[in-house]
Amino acid sequence: MTVLCVVGPTASGKTKMAVALARQLNGEVVSVDSMQIYRGMTIGTAAPTAAEMEGVPHHMIAVADPAEQWSAARFCQAADACIQDILSRGKLPVLAGGTGLYLDALIRGDDFAPGCQGGRTRLRLQQELWELGPREMLRRLEAVDPETAARLHLRDEKRILRALEVYEETGEPMSRRDKRGREKPDRYQALYIGLNFRDRADLRERIDRRVDEMVRRGLLQEVQALLAGGLPRDATALQAIGYKQFLAVADGTATAEQAVEEVKLRSRQYAKRQLTWLRRNPAIHWIYWDKEPDFPAALQNATDFLTAHGLG
């Protein structure tokens, strides 16, 4: 089963390329973005508008209440159902997104452990984290899964809790499960188109322009609407880049100017982490916008690659 993945850092033009390729290849787009799933959060997540979708069906956008907390497992189960539906209708799933963890899990067909829906074990571990701190939780993980613990830092609180949860629910270290998962064939045969810039300054400029556009379109008003709708201030959705900073503006603890600069900084840092993740994948065919004369040329570059690999 073949899928097409359009990947790249934030603000790299994934939506436009994914839509263009979906139109050419009789495809439908599946968003692989951990925040675009939430309703009422289109501006800050840069979810595609109806005009940007150009009539191409999109999935996994605005499907969840922002008060809900979606685990990687829940996301992948829902996205996989979308992929299977698209394939059953003879169309090509075009996966577009920047949440690398979710994309990798989807392609591999990860066998998620019990408890990953946010059950009693997770809630208890979260309470212990609040009471004891990340250092103690990481120490616990070192005792039962030293291989996973060695890859994590104190700030990786969610991953520490996830690894502890897997061990407590299954009696098996996450590192062993991961190793077994790497040994089995991937669920999907994936072709990857990656979008980026050779000159980092160009990507930084794109990110800054996108943030300015979000503010112009009403990011602050979007945050205020979420709060007015009863969304708790500590909801996971409001911890996302953009929302966290403008929540402070809504609360009067920061100015809009301070929030804008913070969002730009955090977005650049996020883009760097995305690229670090993506560069581990040698299968990605990279297209650099600053090396292509225009969008049609970049699209042709992508099409030529896909045709050479039997898609097109």
What are these regions (language model features)?
Residues 1-312:
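Phosphate/pyrophosphate-binding catalytic cores of soluble transferases and nucleic-acid-acting enzymes
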